[in-house]
Amino acid sequence: MKCLERIGNQLLRGVMYHNSAADLFDFLGLNGFYKWQKHQAMDELDSLYYVKHYVMKTHHMLLTIDGSAETPTLFPSNWIGKSAMDATPAEITKAVQSALADLVIWERDAITIYEGIMEETTSSDAKKMLCELIDGSKEEICQIEKLQLKLKSTGYNMMFVHYLQDSYCEKYKK
């Protein structure tokens, strides 16, 4: 049961993390990246609901989630209380580059956490859930790294970043 609580807590942190990324991209007017990260947050939330439902139906208990985790932020601290119009193109470029790098780190850390839980659990259902979560994080890392390569090849040219938004909007429209 403890491993399921740890999975649930990690998923909740994931929801908050991807929500922070969505907020950053929304603030910057990068609607495609916003929809992408909103989609990722909803995927994490769906997984959290699945784990909670599994615990209720299998163990007839409520899953204890620690909601006191600090809300992560991908916003540069000097942007708090400012308008997006105050950000220079160089600051926006740096924020996008930094956010993507942070997302890769986040997903790698999630994999490490899930692998650690996998070593501790004997439940085949929990192991199956963990394998799916690990695979999802690996896919996300691949997607982000491909995007980073594209952007790096253009020097993180903001015209190209804006050009990409339509394809991300199309991919993640609901």
Regions found by a protein language model. Give the residues of each.
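Iron-associated oxidoreductase/ferritin-like identity signal
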Residues: 1-174
